[in-house]
UniProtKB/Swiss-Prot annotation:
This is DNA gyrase subunit B. The keyword Lipid metabolism does not apply. The record marks K462, N465 as: Interaction with DNA. Mg(2+) 1 binds at E437, D510. It comes from Metamycoplasma arthritidis (Mycoplasma arthritidis). SMART domains: HATPase_c, TOP2c. It is found in: Cytoplasm. PROSITE patterns: TOPOISOMERASE_II (PS00177), TOPRIM (PS50880).
Amino acid sequence: MSKQEEISKYGAKNIQFLEGLEAVRKRPGMYIGSIGFRGLHHLIWEIVDNSVDEAMAGFATNIEVKLHPNNEIEVIDNGRGMPVDIHPTTKKSAVETILTVLYAGGKFDSTNYKVSGGLHGVGVSVVNALSDSFEVWVKRGGKFYYQKYINGGHPVKPLEVIGEVNKDETGTRIKFHPDYQIMDKVAFDFGTIIDHAKQIAYLNKGLSISCEDITKNTIRNFCFEGGIIDYVSELNRGKKVIIPDIIYAEGTFRDKTPNAQDVIVNVAIQYNETYTSNIVSYANNIQTGEGGTHEQGFYDALTRIYNKYAEDNKLFKNNNEKISREDTKDGLVAIISIKHTDPIFEGQTKGKLENKDARIATNKIISEQLERYMAENPSHAKAIIEKCLLTQRSRLAANAAREASRKKEGSEFGNLPGKLADCSSKNAEVRELFIVEGNSAGGSAKMGRDRATQAILPLRGKIINAEKQDFTSVMSNKEVSSMIHALGTGITDEFNINKLKYHKIVIMTDADVDGAHIATLLLTFFYRYMRPLIEYGFVYIAQPPLYKISTAKVTEYAYNDAQKEEILSKLEDSKNISIQRYKGLGEMDPEQLWETTMNPATRKYCKFKSMTLLAAIQSFQHWWVKKLNLVMTSFKKC
């Protein structure tokens, strides 16, 4: 069957629907997770995912994402174009059916989409429901179609033909503006769009994705012929690798059970000399941050092949020695990407994959190709095994230290660590922990705080660089030990968010480069050992003022040079203007520290979130202070 015949076979009869759109505007969080920053950007990806599905089906090669000056988003692809014929049930065009009926889409019909990132017919209708303006253009069958919707998915008029195109010219173009009567009035962030688009390009080898910020006349183009091999290379940029090769495994597996479907597996692996891991997994281009069966299969393969190789080549010192899953992680950078016809996810956020055959497929395909690689490259194989055994020794030593520390711990709010001055409230939701640079500022913060809800933990020494030190060294650091004890959650695999004692963790450092560096070191530790604190939005960065500007009548604070000049221009007629530049938090008395940096009514904070894993990893590996300073340009009152 020719490609043109396949295109013509995809029509209205392939569009199935399960229920209406009524609930979306009333309960948007059920469909996009939130109405804030994350949910707003999720609207883009629901549209883009449709275009990616066209690419995975073999019909699209190019996707464009455009950010317009009025905060409109436009997504264009060169896929087949939405079906335009009349749907047999709705008696409306297939375009209108897709855009106005929840759970309507071609993704239910496996003859048209072998693989997709979930039920994306849901997504495009939800975007329409949450937009005050939504336009669609379709090129299909030699004609150019257009339809507009307003106020949450109400069509202005039926789909109409507005022109003609070449018969081989196909595709879909969508332009929407969020309905800010429902969504939080937050602007789209071009950096976030770029980061996510780049991930999609890595996962779809050869797919071209461009992102354009029309206001700033900025365009970024992504196309990776190496796919996830290029992804691993990017994540290891600037690091010394254990072996020069990126081990790549790919294949297709089908279980022998009735009605089994193909599972396509792509995995890329490389070790570096650090003590942390970056394992990122995806199912049908959806990042599975909580792992799942494909990650289990990945570790099954690594531990089995590593142990077999070590035993066969007598690399173990005794018969009781075994490499565990935890021992394989230090320095491991891996991308795991599977494509499944019928992915089963845990929960609406699709954070965890549950298909049993994904575990079998990943294990089998990685095992075969990893075993062959190690047999053909014995020096590289030995280096990997030695890295795992070094990790094992560190892990056992750390476990012993952790057990000794555990015996010292008392009740949940008792036996306070270090110089922690705790607050009186026992309600974690209102409790705030200020991690303060220096004893002097820590003393002022203790005197100026709200003792009911604000706890102070001064940093007495330099925080360790968790990116460059092994587990044992990090755990031996007194400042780290104090933070772990104070927060109460544990770390890494033992981390329990339900035991968190403070729902605001505020990093309060000097407003200079040194302060930014200390903040970065703290963020690096949280990211590597207590990552959910960042992912769930519990970590904030305080923004203390740089200047105090006073006259006989008024006192104002400036947080940067531009703000200082703005204040001075307003006071130009005043006499005896006093300008004090704060070199550090310790120069403020308790009242000033409260007024400028700790008072919930006036303080300025940055809520630090890792919007995408790749962006977060890169921000901790490269350009440390520069990256953090960029993050700290957008502040949010708490």
